[in-house]
Amino acid sequence: MTFEMLYSKIHRATITDANLNYIGSITIDEDLAKLAKLREGMKVEIVDVNNGERFSTYVILGKKRGEICVNGAAARKVAIGDVVIILAYASMNEDEINAHKPSIVLVDEKNEILEKG
């Protein structure tokens, strides 16, 4: 049996852009994404702290420092400046669960890394 478990999280990131006309995804600063163990194309769930919206999309690695941009139709669910939580889950069996520690990255309002746990 497997369970869906938290794999990684970027906590309280700030939306820097919302691009309705781009093919859907979330663009995340590559250094930040890698620290959070997020991969290009990986499914993530976005929770908007400001408005309560919750939606799924996939990761695109961004080149700009601190960039967090929601693209495509999901851009309607956020506003620039909103605070979001970016979550990734993984299916794990009991042994994997016991050995796993989620990657949790806390950031400030400029998406600069405060803490990695």
Swiss-Prot record:
Residue numbers of Pyruvic acid (Ser) PTMs: 25
Membrane-spanning intervals of the chain: none
One BP term from GO: pantothenate biosynthetic process
EC number: 4.1.1.11
Record: residues binding substrate: 57, 72-74
GO MF entry, a single one: aspartate 1-decarboxylase activity
GO cellular component terms, semicolon-separated: cytosol
Location, primary (coarse class): cytoplasm
Known catalytic reactions: L-aspartate + H(+) = beta-alanine + CO2
Active-site feature positions: 25, 58
Recorded metabolic or biological pathway in which this protein acts: Cofactor biosynthesis; (R)-pantothenate biosynthesis; beta-alanine from L-aspartate: step 1/1
InterPro entries reported for this sequence: Asp_de-COase-like_dom_sf (IPR009010), Asp_decarbox (IPR003190)
Cofactor(s) needed: pyruvate
Subunit: Heterooctamer of four alpha and four beta subunits.
Name assigned to this protein: Aspartate 1-decarboxylase
Native source species: Helicobacter pylori (strain ATCC 700392 / 26695) (Campylobacter pylori)
